[in-house]
């Protein structure tokens, strides 16, 4: 939503088996076009339909699958969201393995995105050290643990329909950081 608000023409490809993004887009509130890909073949096929967009974002499941691997192979930037939880970071390791394998044919830029950040949490420091060990850079911006993110999902809105200036601000800063990767 933040990229569309900044004037970019955005497409989002939903590869998550839950199809929550696809279902949300049916409410008519999406500020971008949504495509659905239920298989790795769909991911490769949709790519040709995305040429007219400034950015195409692939939303996937948090676990490694054939479709996740296909999404990595067609991506220019892979954002790996992780929470300060050992189990969450362990699951992200499989995506890093796919990125390393993909580097033999075409290097794909990747960044970790820390979500549900609680500033003084001990696990946050452990997570930051674990990220360093992978060789994949983290974004400077992290998404803080905020109730507005959950409320927005439950209400079928984006955070930009809320009055939470701090949440909107961190999403806008993250968006600028993502765009900068492509400059």
List where the protein language model places each region:
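P-loop/Walker-type NTP enzyme "switch/lid" segment
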Residues: 1-69, 153-161
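Structural beta-sheet core signal
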Residues: 12, 58, 80, 112-114
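Inter-motif core of Ras-like GTPase G domains
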Residues: 65-85
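Conserved C-terminal guanine-recognition region of P-loop GTPase G domains, centered on the G4
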Residues: 92-107
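Beta-strand-loop-alpha "switch" segments that mediate conformational coupling across diverse proteins
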Residues: 118-120, 128-157
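Inter-lobe coupling/hinge region of RecA-like P-loop helicase motors
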Residues: 149-172
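Short, hydrophobic alpha-helical segments
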Residues: 178-183
